[in-house]
Regions:
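Tryptophan-centered short beta-strand motifs
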Residues: 71-73, 134-136, 202-207, 266-269
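A mature extracytoplasmic/lumenal domain signature
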Residues: 57-59, 67-68, 114-116, 125-131, ...
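Hydrophobic pocket/interface hotspot
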Residues: 41, 53, 61, 110, ...
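Short, low-complexity N-terminal intrinsically disordered segments enriched in polar/charged residues
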Residues: 15-51, 55, 143-180, 184
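Sec-dependent signal peptide recognition
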Residues: 2-7, 127
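Bacterial N-terminal signal peptides
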Residues: 5-15
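Short beta-strand edge/turn micro-motifs at domain boundaries
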Residues: 109, 120-148, 245, 254-279
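Surface-exposed, charged secondary-structure patches
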Residues: 62-67, 72-120, 191, 196, ...
Length: 279
């Protein structure tokens, strides 16, 4: 009797699995095979080689989109003719990915995203296994232009360099005992808070005004006890059109800096620093 009860329980435990399992679910091998035409399609865009398009698509496939109020309907050969045989000039900035792939039996659908500098293209592919080989039967797509950067954003590389230069002026002002570089890189309403560790290992905070920093720069390394080429590692974290943040690792420790643009010039407004952290 005990054996019968266990047997019945085992059957009951299996039944839900049998009921919910999709008998047509694709195996890993089948999924990998269905990815091949999708990868050929991506390779066509990456290399500009039209032969990848011919490998990816069924010969009678259609490529369609609704653009400028009209239906665009291309044959495979018409679509392949758009590939020049070489990568795009901005290929290094282009990204592509297979977002999803769903297969049932010998049919499937996939979504591919082409993320380009000026536009994002979304492809929806219908796939079919024909004579034992997966092919793209149909493609519909939508392209969405990206917002053009503002004039301020367009200056970002220059701004980033200007932010880095302001931090460099600050650290080299101290290394080279040159107060003038504090004057050109630090705002006079500076807020500076430091944490210095004493001999007992306790951090003690203290504040410094702009004038105190200016005076310190003139005397801190006046005797040249610290080499002018001492550590000055600068990492610019973020630059917006008006504000920025950066990190400085120097001889005295670590500084986290906020900067703002005044009359077109980047100036340090806040500094939070500490002596070298405990190892």
């Amino acid at each position: 009797m005990r054996v019968l009860v266990l047997f019945v329980a085992a059957i009951i435990g299996v039944v839900p699995y049998l009921e919910t399992r999709d008998p047509h679910a694709a195996s890993e091998a089948e999924t990998a095979a269905a990815r091949i035409p999708l990868e050929n399609y991506i390779n066509a865009h990456a290399t500009g080689n039209p032969e990848y398009i011919r490998k990816a698509f069924f010969p009678e496939a259609k490529i369609m989109a609704f653009r400028d109020g009209k239906l665009l309907n291309l044959s495979v050969e018409e679509f392949a003719s758009r590939f020049s045989g070489k990568p795009a000039a901005d290929e290094s900035q282009r990204k592509r990915r297979i977002d999803s792939l769903n297969i049932t039996g010998n049919a499937g659908v996939a979504r591919i995203v082409l993320d380009y500098p000026e536009t994002t293209l979304t492809d929806y592919m219908s796939l079919l296994k024909v004579d034992g080989e997966w092919k793209i039967i149909n493609k519909v797509f939508y392209g969405e232009p990206k917002a053009k950067p503002s004039s301020a954003a367009a200056q970002l590389p220059d701004d980033r360099e200007a932010v880095k230069q302001a931090v460099l002026d600050y650290v080299e002002a101290l290394y080279e005992a040159d107060s003038a570089r504090i004057q050109r890189s630090v705002h006079q309403e500076l807020f500076k808070l430091g944490f210095e560790r004493d001999k007992e290992g306790t951090y003690k905070p203290y504040r410094m005004t702009y004038q105190e920093l200016y005076d310190l720069a003139g005397r801190w390394n006046k005797t040249g006890r610290i080499p002018k080429n001492s550590k000055k590692e600068i990492v610019v974290y973020d630059v917006a059109d008006q504000t920025a943040s950066a990190k400085l690792t120097a001889r005295w420790g670590i500084d986290y800096l906020h900067l703002a643009k005044f009359d077109g010039k980047w100036m340090i407004t806040d500094i939070l620093w500490q002596t070298p952290p405990r190892s």
